Curated annotation (Swiss-Prot):
InterPro entries: C56_PfpI-like, Class_I_gatase-like, DJ-1/PfpI. It comes from the Bacteria. Residues 3-171 form the PfpI endopeptidase domain. This is Uncharacterized protein SSP1625. Pfam families: DJ-1_PfpI. The lineage of its organism: Bacteria, Bacillati, Bacillota, Bacilli, Bacillales. PROSITE patterns: PEPTIDASE_C56_PFPI.
Amino acid sequence: MTKKVAIILADEFEDIELTSPKEALENAGFETEVIGDTEKHELVGKHGEKVTVDVSIADAKPENYDALLIPGGFSPDHLRGDEEGRYGTFTKYFTQNDVPTFAICHGPLLLVDTDDLKGRTITGVINVRKDLSNAGAHVVDESVVIDNNIVTSRVPDDLDDFNREIIKKLKA
């Protein structure tokens, strides 16, 4: 059976941090589904990339996915602003059940909402590192960091390393 990766997303995502890993996953034979507020709604990235939501967060069931991808940009901040906390709850399923969880740039911010960063080693773009540290994570400045089921990366320049490691994690 083909492994399926959930991608949680809102407007103003960092375009390449969605398109590059999504393409790498699909080229490696994995299925991806974009999850957002409203099914069939079109989301627009910071640089104009458009993507359609496949499944609404209200209908998405984390147990139906083999991994989670959280691209960066301003999307994670919008997701964290969900009044019902649905994206944090969705993400927490993956972190607490040792399901592969991939986050790049600002994406690791959503991991703060899981209350599951204490003692974890992760990375992210420089301006989110203080938040990650305050949540109990050991934050390092490396292109890609793997801590059990969580794979994090810093910026678009790290995408080759990030993509390689998320594919490796899913093939394990």
